């Protein structure tokens, strides 16, 4: 699969490929984890500008953490199959509920190993940030994400309940 996919940051011409992703997720119960603020934007230029704010301390919104957004593109047809976001460090909320990594795969592209590939291939970037392990969380009802995390060496660390969303998250650590 290494030759089939690539992780790229959403800048320049590649950004046009994200235009249809929110439509593909709408109507689903998906939270679009790993897509950054994409759901809030119709205008991709505005999305790009907002995403850039999370890459530098001087423009980072208050209470947020530095983050790098990646698109997962299938090379054979230049199709956007998923997104993954790396949070450079954890604040109190992310330490409990979000973790270092969030990811989503386009519903029509699921069960093809793309989430596992993204999680594996973003790990060298995490190491380059000085991280020795990463926290990855998933809903306790999301068997696919659980399998993805376990396939990448995830060690179960317990659960956390989000009362505001009435959801239980499973927490896993992956050693880099």
List each model region and its residues.
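Conserved acetyl-CoA-binding loop-helix of GNAT-fold acetyltransferases
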Residues: 102-105, 111-124, 128, 147-151
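GNAT-family acyltransferases
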Residues: 1-100, 165-176
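A short, internal acetyl-CoA/4′-phosphopantetheine-binding micro-motif in the GNAT/acyltransferase core
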Residues: 73, 87, 100-111, 139
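Conserved GNAT acetyl-CoA-binding A-motif
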Residues: 126-137
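Conserved G/P- and acidic residue-centered "switch" motifs that form tight phosphate/ATP-binding loops
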Residues: 78, 113, 130, 142
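Conserved catalytic-core motifs of GNAT/GCN5-like acyltransferases
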Residues: 137-138, 155-170
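Conserved beta-strand-loop-alpha-helix junction that forms the acyl-donor binding cleft
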Residues: 136-146
């Amino acid at each position: 699969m290494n030759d089939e996919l690539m992780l790229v940051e959403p800048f320049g011409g590649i950004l046009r490929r994200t235009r249809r992703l929110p439509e593909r997720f709408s109507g689903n119960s998906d939270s679009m984890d790993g897509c950054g603020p994409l759901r809030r934007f119709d205008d991709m230029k505005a999305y790009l500008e907002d995403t850039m704010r999370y890459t530098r301390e001087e423009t980072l919104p208050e209470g947020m953490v530095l983050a790098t957004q990646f698109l997962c593109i299938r090379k054979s047809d230049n199709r956007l199959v998923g997104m993954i976001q790396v949070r450079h460090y954890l604040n109190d909320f992310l330490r409990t509920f979000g973790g270092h990594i969030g990811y989503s795969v386009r519903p029509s592209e699921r069960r093809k190993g793309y989430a596992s590939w993204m999680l594996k291939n973003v790990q060298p970037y995490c190491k380059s940030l000085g991280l020795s392990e990463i926290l990855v969380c998933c809903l306790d009802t999301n068997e696919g994400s659980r399998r993805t995390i376990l396939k990448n060496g995830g060690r179960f660390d317990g659960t956390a309940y989000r009362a505001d969303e009435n959801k239980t998250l499973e927490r896993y650590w992956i050693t880099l």
